[in-house]
């Protein structure tokens, strides 16, 4: 039987005492703090401009690239940050929550493309698309 109730129904989901920080490494927490800072300092203003003018949020993605986030899930040996799916989920949530939902959506598509390349990397694909990420190139 469930220990908690949701109205008249048993509650089987996560309780209020669950803390998502439990699954983050110290490095991932540092990355989140950096992201929140970037969102507050620049991304949010860029989001307003992009939304008002119906523009692709290029500057926000460039900003993510300047700090290594475009290569978040790329192994360190190829110039990426070498993080896992938990860091990816945290990054998307943080960008959407504190900065720009459009940027978060574009970032998801970007990492999806990067992941597809990394699933079956060839020297040509690595040189053309993956290694430039370390310089922040989209």
Language-model-derived ranges and their functions:
Residues 1-27:
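Intrinsic disorder at enzyme termini
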Residues 2-7, 37-40, 68, 76:
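Alpha-helix capping/hinge segments and adjacent helical runs
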Residues 25, 29, 131-134:
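Short alpha-helical segments used as structural interaction elements across diverse proteins
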Residues 27-41:
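A non-catalytic, amphipathic alpha-helix used as a structural packing/dimerization or gating element
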Residues 44, 48-138:
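Glycine-rich flavin
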